Amino acid sequence: LITERVSTDLEELIIDGGTDGTDDYLSLVDGVFTLSTSNVLDFSDETDDVSKHIFKAGIVSMPNKYLRKRDAMRFYVSPNMELEYADSLADRATPLGDANIQRNMFNYAYGVPVKPVSLMPDAKYLFTFPKNIIFGVQRDIMIESDRDIRTQVLIVVVTMRIDLAYEEEDAVVTASGLSTDFNQPTTTTA
């Protein structure tokens, strides 16, 4: 359980980190969206649903020198966005549409895999090579525990030194302001 919690916390820091933020934890290091400054797309004025057009804009924004190995790149999206994109493909009256409904397929946008990341915000995506994201952890990882006998809680603190960077910052496209209206059903409480 400790490793799962640490991986979740690190994923949150990698995605949402920003040293100018107000959250003590997230301000420890700049995350992938904060570090990306060259190719930033803003879809705030768009009202389109998740479709191929948002992915096309990311590919067009990527410098041509990196597109030679497009199949090695990834679109990192939220699970909701990945599901919405799969649903848009499933609406097609073709074998691809049928396959998206019947099987858990890996979806592609213009030859680039679309991968869901559990803590990715719904309104954002990241387009880059997986190996372009450099995440470093110092060897000295300290695990400390304490027990609060009154509340019967075991407290575990994991301390480590980390850093995050891009090997090639201009080989990253980030998008924000994407539509988050995923046609979710209205729930009522009794």
Report each predicted region and the residues it spans:
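Hydrophobic alpha-helical segments and helix-packing faces
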Residues: 51, 55, 75-78
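Short, conserved, surface-exposed binding loops centered on an aromatic residue
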Residues: 63-68, 104-106
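Sequence/fold signature of self-assembling virion shell proteins
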Residues: 30-50, 86-190
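Long, contiguous amphipathic alpha-helices that act as assembly "spine/axial" helices in icosahedral shell
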Residues: 1-36, 66-82, 114, 141, ...
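Phosphate-interacting basic helix/loop segments used at nucleotide- and nucleic-acid interfaces
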Residues: 52-66
